[in-house]
């Protein structure tokens, strides 16, 4: 079984307060991944912060308000939201996470007997930001499922800068996370 985890494809990371041209360039690849994956094998995370984000530990280190719950920036970008709607992905598979990595995501994966029993399990991650939330969730998946193939599709990920994306991919490879399509990112062209 192959699980797809779509990480934080939210307006604020694509076109909003922390948006980049690299993030905008991967939207189509993320949508393609969603379209080719059965709905029951898709999980989605959303970075979720309170209004007082700037007073949190993260806010002190990254003083840019983003993904504030209830705002447009918190919503998934329209193309991704539409693809998930067309696939009829269950709302229970959408995880609001207040941190970079989601323990709730891991708990949901571990509570599924089919996933736990699968000796050929593959967990693929796509989304934003390669060096923060994709990296954190990929490492959590590798720790929770050490015998699974944890895969990151580099062509469906972007980071704050191309250099930080490359650094994150190198770090994930050290942790035995498979990186596919590195060098084929649409924003490299």
What are the residue ranges of the model-derived segments?
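Glycine-rich anion-binding loop/nest that anchors nucleotide
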Residues: 121-133, 151-157
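Active-site-proximal beta-strand/loop segments in catalytic clefts of secreted hydrolases
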Residues: 45-48, 98, 128, 155
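Active-site acidic carboxylates
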Residues: 1-94, 115-121, 147-151, 160-174, ...
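Short, well-ordered secondary-structure micro-motifs
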Residues: 54-56, 105-108, 136-137, 163-164
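Histidine-anchored nucleotide/phosphate-binding helix
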Residues: 31-35, 133-145
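Short, small-residue-enriched loops and turns at beta-alpha junctions
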Residues: 102-103, 157-161
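A two-mode feature
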Residues: 127, 137, 177-180
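Glycine-rich phosphate- or other oxyanion-binding loops that anchor nucleotides, phosphorylated ligands
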Residues: 92-110
């Amino acid at each position: 079984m192959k699980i797809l985890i779509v990480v934080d494809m939210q307006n604020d990371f694509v076109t909003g307060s922390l948006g980049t041209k690299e993030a905008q360039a991967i939207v189509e690849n993320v949508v393609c991944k969603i379209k080719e994956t059965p709905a029951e094998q898709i999980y989605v995370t959303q970075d979720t912060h309170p209004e007082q984000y700037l007073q949190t530990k993260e806010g002190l280190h990254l003083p840019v308000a983003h993904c504030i719950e209830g705002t447009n920036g918190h919503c998934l970008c329209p193309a991704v939201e539409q693809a998930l709607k067309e696939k009829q992905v269950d709302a229970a598979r959408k995880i609001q996470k207040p941190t970079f990595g989601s323990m709730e995501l891991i708990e949901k994966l571990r509570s599924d007997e089919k996933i736990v029993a699968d000796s050929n399990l593959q967990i693929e991650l796509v989304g934003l930001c390669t060096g923060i939330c994709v990296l954190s969730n990929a490492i959590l998946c590798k720790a929770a499922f050490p015998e699974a193939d944890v895969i990151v599709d580099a062509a469906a990920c972007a980071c704050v800068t191309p250099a930080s994306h490359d650094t994150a991919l190198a770090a994930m490879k050290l942790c035995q996370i498979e990186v596919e399509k590195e060098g084929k990112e649409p924003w490299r062209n």
